[in-house]
């Protein structure tokens, strides 16, 4: 039986992680370690100025007073009795497509698995109602089983986005590239009860690059999107042009 580490950024009691853990437990030994609160948008942040504390919950999960990245790092380095065969992060309540991936704690948790030498996938449910976590969990389980026979390179992760639809309405799977959003909308300014100004982040930008071949396009058409991601952010097509002038400064 394989060993799977499960984490997320929505918190240890979120419906997505419960559905994911249940589906994977049908064929694997699963350890679920996740933040004790919602950490959406935490990206790859680590807790460096405070100690991490764990809490063993009644359902066997472990909560941590840290970020998604903290959870995966702590689990692999300290809590897992046997090194996991794979890290699975999710199921996120909402899309992680295009630019979202740079902010996502869900994707970051999977990336931390990759940084520690393990294959990893991030799974998100895309839609307005967010009720079909069972659909996303089924696909997550299928993908994990597939990776046992077709391992991915350890310098990448798979980013999976599943439409919020009943299983029978999913049209299939498409391997995609990341799309892109327009820039985010403005800040929302209001006041607290004491009359002091406070600010909220505005909505994310609307879809900009969402055509054929993108994650946005696949999900909108009713397909599960799977995008292989790597941590190398180098803009290779800019290297020569930049070197032509900047080394002369």
Swiss-Prot record:
Quote the record's cofactor note.
Binds 1 divalent metal cation per subunit.
Reactions performed catalytically? a ribonucleoside 5'-phosphate + H2O = a ribonucleoside + phosphate
Task: Please give the Gene Ontology molecular function terms for this protein.
Answer: 3'-nucleotidase activity; 5'-nucleotidase activity; exopolyphosphatase activity; metal ion binding; nucleotide binding
Query: Keywords, A to Z?
Result: Cytoplasm, Hydrolase, Metal-binding, Nucleotide-binding
Entry binding sites for a divalent metal cation: 9-10, 40, 92
Localization annotation: Cytoplasm
Q: Which EC number(s) are documented for this chain?
A: 3.1.3.5
What GO cellular component is one of the record's annotations?
cytoplasm
**HAMAP family of this UniProt entry?**
SurE
The identity of this protein, by name, is: 5'-nucleotidase SurE
Recorded source organism is Shewanella frigidimarina (strain NCIMB 400)
């Amino acid at each position: 039986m394989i060993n799977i580490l499960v984490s997320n950024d929505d918190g240890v009691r979120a419906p997505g992680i419960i559905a994911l853990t249940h589906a994977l437990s049908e064929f694997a030994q699963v350890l679920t370690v996740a933040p004790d609160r919602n950490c959406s948008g935490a990206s790859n942040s680590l807790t460096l100025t405070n100690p991490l504390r764990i809490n063993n919950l009644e359902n066997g999960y472990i909560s941590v007073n840290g970020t998604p990245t903290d959870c995966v790092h702590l689990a692999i380095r300290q809590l897992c009795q046997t090194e996991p065969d794979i890290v699975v992060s999710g199921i996120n309540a909402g899309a992680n497509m295009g630019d979202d991936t740079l902010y996502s704690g869900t994707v970051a948790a999977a990336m931390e698995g990759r940084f520690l030498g393990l294959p990893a996938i991030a799974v998100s449910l895309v839609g307005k109602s967010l009720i079909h976590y069972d659909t996303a969990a089924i696909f997550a389980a299928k993908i994990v089983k597939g990776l046992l026979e077709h391992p991915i390179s350890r310098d990448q992760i798979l980013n999976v986005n599943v439409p919020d639809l009943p299983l029978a309405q999913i049209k299939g799977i498409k391997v995609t590239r990341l799309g892109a959003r327009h820039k985010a909308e403005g800040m929302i300014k209001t006041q607290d009860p004491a009359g002091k100004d406070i600010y909220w982040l505005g909505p994310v930008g609307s879809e900009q690059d969402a055509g054929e071949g993108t994650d946005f396009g696949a999900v909108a058409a009713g397909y599960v999107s799977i995008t292989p991601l790597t941590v190398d952010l180098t803009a290779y097509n800019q290297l020569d042009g930049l070197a032509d002038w900047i080394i002369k400064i």
